[in-house]
Amino acid sequence: MPPRPRFDRHAPERELPNINERISYSSLRVVDSDGTQLGVISREEALEVAKERELDLVLVSEKATPPVCRIMNYGKFKFEQEKKAKEAKKKSHQTEVKEVKMRYKIDQHDYQVRISQATRFLKAGDKVKCTVIFRGREIQHTALAETLLKRMSKDLEEKAEVQQSPKREGRNMIMFLTPRKTPLLKKESETTEPKKALRSIN
């Protein structure tokens, strides 16, 4: 029985960058590391210039005639590109909106479940749409729904900021919360009350 191959010979090769000796074109339009145009020169001459600069010759436009190369620090360039891609991905994630639905007569247990859901969404960097749903004549109790949403924003104030205060939207009342970017500064009265309580106990 023949030995099993150590790797799949038909598997696609990892895409390698077109830099230095991997560039096969005989003539190249070369841009120096400071942006200076070096004009159209031979591959060998371009490689020699890059070697003198202790940098890399990188193919940046293969479709041009002749192809365009730039002399640069490829390792630094690759790092910056990956950093920009990560930042772009992070920013795009923050645009998501998650929704938490409830009734204005919600009990304490279900309310805590909604608080936990909203907390999880906020920690993930998502905005939260808090929705109170009315059925039938319940629409008369918008004041109670507004009170509930304000209570929710208060309970989540350390993690969230109110982006849109409670307001009617059709047969619902909604409020938008966004992850808090700056720490919540507590009022002086809130920080001194525990100290007063300790003095009264002593």
UniProtKB/Swiss-Prot annotation:
The lineage of its organism: Bacteria, Bacillati, Cyanobacteriota, Cyanophyceae, Synechococcales. The keyword Signal does not apply. It comes from Prochlorococcus marinus (strain NATL1A). This is Translation initiation factor IF-3. Residues 178-202 are annotated as: Disordered. The gene is infC. GO terms for biological process: ribosome disassembly. IF-3 binds to the 30S ribosomal subunit and shifts the equilibrium between 70S ribosomes and their 50S and 30S subunits in favor of the free subunits, thus enhancing the availability of 30S subunits on which protein synthesis initiation begins. GO terms for molecular function: ribosome binding; translation initiation factor activity. The keyword Aminoacyl-tRNA synthetase does not apply. GO terms for cellular component: cytosol; membrane. Monomer. Belongs to the IF-3 family. SUPFAM superfamilies: Translation initiation factor IF3, C-terminal domain (SSF55200), Translation initiation factor IF3, N-terminal domain (SSF54364). Keywords: Cytoplasm, Initiation factor, Protein biosynthesis. Its main location: cytoplasm. PROSITE patterns: IF3. Gene3D superfamilies: Translation initiation factor 3 (IF-3), C-terminal domain, Translation initiation factor 3 (IF-3), N-terminal domain.
